[in-house]
Amino acid sequence: MTKSFTKYHGLGNDFILIDNRHQLQPILTPEQAIELCDRNFGIGADGVIFALPGVKQTDYTMRIFNSDGSEPEMCGNGIRCLAKFIAELENNNKTKYNIHTGAGIIVPELQGDGQVTVDMGQPRLLASEIPTTLANADDKVVDQLLEVGGKSWFVTCVSMGNPHCITFVEDVTAIDLAKIGPKFEHNPVFPERTNTEFIQVISPKYVKMRVWERGAGATLACGTGACASVVAGVLTQNNERLVTVELPGGCLEIEWSTIDQKIYMTGPAEKVFTGIIA
């Protein structure tokens, strides 16, 4: 049976989008996702995203398989791509969707300029919510020392429905992601592994970020990581609440609202091509 797909990217973080509206389970297996994500022998992508029927009064359900076959709770760049994909499938004037994810209900909204703004919900700061065994007396991890790769790093941990470990550095270009990234990801203090963000503060309103994603490795962008990093920057007094985050693939605008304490992410999602899986 052939299956159609559409490839999208959000700042170079690329995904294979599958119309899965006819059933509640993904029509592809994690093993098939690994094959499709292979950049030499497959389509090439950081993950496969499925648009499934909504549950609990939501419009849609989002499932995603990473390029290694693992399933994350959510993906910030991916949900912007999913919103654009859904809008194309429905072909109507609707611009806002309630999407059920493993991280809870996420609400993306298409903007008139082609950008997508996503209500990412409130960040979670308790060590048990991340999860991590690294915690201060208040059960939070803020600017705490962690030994990784024979070096001491000051880290702050934030969950955006998926785990993030953020560390501030003088120069993000000096970080050997391929070497240090896996050591953070698989550190035993993170029982479910972790995404890791390395942040260079240019000003209180502008930071540079490189990321090692759990299950995907070094990517050009990570939406949830950008959100978590701004939260970490506020907690450590490194940046303000409205920040431009520069990633290798481009920039995201992140706001941690003082009104509802939610994180709002704004960025692009671009269609690349469509095709058929034989």
From Swiss-Prot:
InterPro entries: DAP_epimerase_AS, DAP_epimerase_DapF. It is found in: Cytoplasm. The active site is at residues 75, 222. One of its GO terms (cellular component) is cytosol. Signal peptide: none annotated. One of its GO terms (biological process) is lysine biosynthetic process via diaminopimelate. Keywords: Amino-acid biosynthesis, Cytoplasm, Isomerase, Lysine biosynthesis. Pathway: Amino-acid biosynthesis; L-lysine biosynthesis via DAP pathway; DL-2,6-diaminopimelate from LL-2,6-diaminopimelate: step 1/1. Its EC number is 5.1.1.7. It comes from the Bacteria. GO terms for molecular function: diaminopimelate epimerase activity. Substrate binds at residues 13, 66, 76-77, 162, 195, 213-214, 223-224. The record marks 164, 213 as: Could be important to modulate the pK values of the two catalytic cysteine residues. It catalyses: (2S,6S)-2,6-diaminopimelate = meso-2,6-diaminopimelate. Homodimer. Belongs to the diaminopimelate epimerase family. Catalyzes the stereoinversion of LL-2,6-diaminopimelate (L,L-DAP) to meso-diaminopimelate (meso-DAP), a precursor of L-lysine and an essential component of the bacterial peptidoglycan. NCBIfam families: DapF. This is Diaminopimelate epimerase.
